[in-house]
Amino acid sequence: DTDVEVIKPMNDIIERGAFMGCENELKPGGTSILAVAPGLGLGCIPRLGFNEDMLNLYAGLHFQYAGNDLNQKTVVEYTTELLVAKGLRNIDDIQCVNEIWIYPKEYFCPIDYRTNKMNVTCNTRSIHHFAASWKSWDEKMKIIIARIIGTKLTHILGNARRCIIGKK
């Protein structure tokens, strides 16, 4: 992505081989799954089979359906699903999947996009400033409200709103 700022050398990561990073972290007792985001930083090696698999996947996709509905699935979702099929585990640790090193959120994405709080650690190499230009106005407003009043209260208010107006 163009909104990524490199703050620390990545020589050790690059020397290790192909890599990508996660844009989220797992919360104790939570139900989230890792989301691997190539836009945070992507290191490749020649003839990496995973790249061919991704190209083959995209070659068969349609991004506009009959009736002009759009395929809204992101590269993060496609990448994560393919990595899960190849052995990605739902853990907050460095792991090697199909010759690709997958790094936890703290390495390439230290900002929590919901709260805008940054948690730079000794492992952080870059910062994804997360413009979220693809998100709808409603989704952007939810992020802004969550930053002001907190994610839990935003979730409660969102559920109440859906109950009142009858939307899922």
Residue ranges of model-derived segments:
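Glycosyltransferase-associated regions of secretory-pathway enzymes
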Residues: 2-168
